[in-house]
């Protein structure tokens, strides 16, 4: 895991990472030692820019004089966010996932990204992404579907995920469109 430390005025230069996904916005502030100082995760409500702006203003207001060494964007809205906030770097999300996975597990050979609207799998061979698999059936099994179903069943999505992870038997919901998955669950 990544160490978390107090976000103080004397933390030195920081790096800000923004992941603007199809359904959520994630923002992290880390120090020069890659220790987490601040995180934010929220639904983007179809319009990520005001939410990101609000978070950045909050950070600058709470930490005047903060020295920002770099701001990097990734995700579905990478270019939009990069241009809107004049960020230093934009990083394709597959590369961002691979870089993060290697940090925690240098010999990683497979990565799964379950996003809000799609699901991607990356095969890693000889230290590089060798193949990418993308689900081709609308948003089956993705974040927005799972979140909607968790709410419909009266669960917080984190609790719902934990229940699924530790279930005695997996449930076959099919592998097609969420409309068909909805029918499978209701049966």
Region annotations inferred by a language model:
Residues 1-7, 89-95:
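Charged, flexible boundary elements
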Residues 18-58, 136:
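Short glycine-rich, Thr/Ser-proximal phosphate-binding strand/loop in the N-terminal lobe
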Residues 27-29, 35, 52-59, 69-80, ...:
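N-terminal cofactor/phosphate-binding cores enriched in small/glycine residues
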Residues 28-31, 80-86, 120-127, 133-135, ...:
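Short acidic, glycine/serine/threonine-rich loops at helix termini
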Residues 44, 60-94, 123, 130-131, ...:
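Short beta-strand-loop/turn "lid" adjacent to the catalytic site in phosphate-handling enzymes
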Residues 44-49, 126-169, 182:
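Glycine-rich phosphate-binding loop plus the immediately following alpha-helix
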Residues 171-187:
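A contiguous, well-structured pocket-lining segment that forms one wall/lid of small-molecule binding clefts
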